[in-house]
Amino acid sequence: MKKLFFISFFLIASCSKSGDLVMSKNAKDIIGNNNYPAISYGGYRGKSREVQPSIVDIKEDLKIMFAQGFRVIRTYDLHHPFAENTLKAISELKNSDSDFEMYVMLGAWIQCKDAFTDVPIHNEEDLEGNKVEIAEAVRLAQDYQDIVKVIAVGNEAMVHWATSYHLEPKYILKWVKYLQDLKINGTINNNIWITSSDNFASWGGGSEEYHNDDLDELIRSVDYVSMHTYAFHDTYYNPVFWNLSGDLEDLSKKDIIKKAIQKAVEYELSQFNSVQEYIHGIDSS
């Protein structure tokens, strides 16, 4: 059965550069494992990505996340030094502390032609930029085999509300298949899982405008589906979601919050279930 995992934004054996001993955990051991909580990680201190956090800054963050129990982090792009510096920081922490454990879901940013301009071309890809992102993902997956366990092709690159950069599923599919071929020929570790990080609608759980043969083939081609759902952020479009019904007015503040959280969980599970239903109609294996 095709594995499906969701990221909720309601809350928020070889040698490599990172050491001589490759950790035994693979993607199949950590993804979906409650003992390996994951969190998306940016690490930026300023208002612009042009101001990059130092490796010292990143180490500070990693120690905090490790102390909180997180064991997997997700990054977003590779056209800034941040992702590689994060891998360097993890490697250095591992080498200085044998108890430190952290894995990475490495995001490769994929976008359409003329993204972030006044006239993005959504039916074409930014070929040169996307090639650089994928090449960097491959290089880092080779250099940090003990840390990089997942490569995610695109971050919310297919959902239509990403008006500045979204593109058609066929381009995500192309790069997913390319990476799967590299696993087969031994260029990258065969145990790395390949996916795409995207909104529930993009994975078939929304309207029929997203349903097409390329999406269906993408579902068959990824190692698992990484689905995003965000009860909090979605209320930008649906602010009445958090309005109190009359039967809650007499409850304590704690009970009101508890019911609001439960409502959000149910909201996210409904999106998960809609994607799961679509996926099982495509690939029941």
Positions of PLM-derived features:
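C-terminal motif of bacterial Sec signal peptides marking the signal peptidase cleavage site
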Residues: 13-14
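Alpha-helical scaffolding within the catalytic cores
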Residues: 22-26, 60, 132-139, 200-216
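Substrate-binding cleft of extracellular glycoside hydrolase catalytic domains
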Residues: 23, 78, 84-192
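Catalytic domains of carbohydrate-active enzymes, especially glycoside hydrolases
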Residues: 57-81
